[in-house]
């Protein structure tokens, strides 16, 4: 009974925390307004003598004023525009493929191929958003008075983003296949659990990317604090199930998704209770497939280590 109460409380905290972005956005804007504004120096007419001294190194030209950064809201609107743009591109591809295959009386095949195109589009959007969201992430950190995350090499950031995105695709497939389970009353609950947890994975990935948390560490966090993440992802899961039209639900997701990413920064998912929350390995299947793909890619990727290459050749 105590464990059930703890699970319910953690779910409640996650659900409530998912709406913190409403006040947090205002806090970010207030913090942005407090930033020191550097006024550019007044232009001074340069004489021939000043230019001659600049060449000789006697007189140095004053430094250029720092470029003004894009505002938080401008970056946010850019991400909104990109999300909608990717969705429109996806729909155009579906229409073109459907029209092309209609000449062979295989319109459905064209549409199905178009739906599969969401996978490469999803990968592209994740990479671009990871780059664009860095400024928003910095604004969130400053509003929370947190130290900036350590600088991560681009290659490491890209690898982590791709692995995480691949795992999310497998987890999405796992959730979609679960709707075919022959359990009438329980099957919808299982599907909902997958979608809510998947939404939390999407939202918290950007925060975890900033701190360069490994994929295994993220997996352990989600499986150890699953009631919280279940509650956090519930509002987005409910909003994206309003319509039976996949495109409409995708538009709703694209509009709400950046807001919930911002909300993940002030969220407190690591609460302590009287007893530990039972860990559920709901990522086991998707993790297994992600690991298999990772090993396959590693096996076909040429190594730069001559010793390792020599050992592989001898074996």
Curated annotation (Swiss-Prot):
Compartment(s) where it occurs, according to its Swiss-Prot or TrEMBL record: Cytoplasm; Membrane
Domain of life: Eukaryota
GO cellular component: endoplasmic reticulum; membrane
Lipid bilayer topology: Multi-pass membrane protein
Spans through the membrane: 84-104, 113-133, 146-166, 190-210, 221-241, 242-262
Tissue-specificity statement: Expressed in pharyngeal and body wall muscles and intestine cells.
Changes seen on gene knockout: Early autophagic structures and lgg-1 puncta form an irregular shape and clump together. RNAi-mediated knockdown results in increased lgg-2-positive autophagosomes following fertilization and at later embryonic stages.
The entry's keywords: Autophagy, Cytoplasm, Membrane, Transmembrane, Transmembrane helix
Record-linked PANTHER family: ETOPOSIDE-INDUCED PROTEIN 2.4 HOMOLOG, P53 INDUCED PROTEIN
Record-stated family: Belongs to the EI24 family.
Function comment: Involved in autophagy. Thought to act in autophagasome and omegasome formation.
Name this polypeptide is given: Ectopic P granules protein 4
Organism: Caenorhabditis elegans
């Amino acid at each position: 009974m105590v464990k059930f109460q703890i699970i319910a409380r953690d779910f409640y905290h996650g659900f409530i925390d998912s709406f913190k972005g409403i006040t947090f956005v205002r806090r970010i804007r207030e913090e942005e307004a407090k930033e020191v504004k550097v006024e550019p120096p007044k232009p001074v007419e340069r004489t021939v003598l000043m230019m001659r001294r600049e060449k000789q190194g006697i007189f140095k030209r004053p430094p250029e004023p720092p470029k003004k950064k894009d505002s938080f809201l401008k970056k946010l609107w850019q991400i909104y525009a990109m999300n909608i743009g990717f969705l429109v591109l996806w729909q155009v591809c579906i229409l073109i493929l459907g029209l092309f295959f209609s000449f062979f009386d295989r319109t459905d095949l064209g549409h199905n191929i178009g739906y599969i195109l969401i996978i490469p589009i999803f990968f592209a959007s994740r990479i671009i958003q990871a780059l664009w969201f860095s400024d928003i992430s910095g604004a969130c950190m400053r509003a929370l008075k947190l130290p900036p995350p350590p600088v991560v090499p681009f290659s490491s950031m890209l690898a982590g983003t791709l692995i995480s995105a691949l795992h999310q695709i497998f987890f999405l497939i796992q959730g979609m296949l679960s709707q075919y389970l022959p359990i009438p009353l329980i099957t919808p609950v299982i599907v909902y659990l997958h979608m809510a947890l998947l939404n939390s994975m999407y939202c918290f990935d950007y925060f975890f990317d900033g701190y360069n948390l490994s994929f295994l560490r993220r997996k352990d966090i989600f499986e150890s604090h699953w009631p919280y993440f279940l509650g956090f992802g519930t509002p987005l899961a409910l909003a994206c199930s309003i319509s039976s039209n996949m495109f409409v639900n995708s538009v709703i997701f694209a509009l709400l998704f950046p807001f919930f990413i911002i909300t993940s920064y002030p969220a407190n998912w690591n609460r302590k209770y009287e007893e530990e929350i039972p860990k559920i390995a709901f990522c086991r299947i998707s993790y297994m497939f992600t690991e298999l793909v990772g090993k396959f890619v590693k096996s076909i990727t040429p190594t730069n280590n001559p010793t390792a290459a020599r050992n592989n050749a001898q074996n």
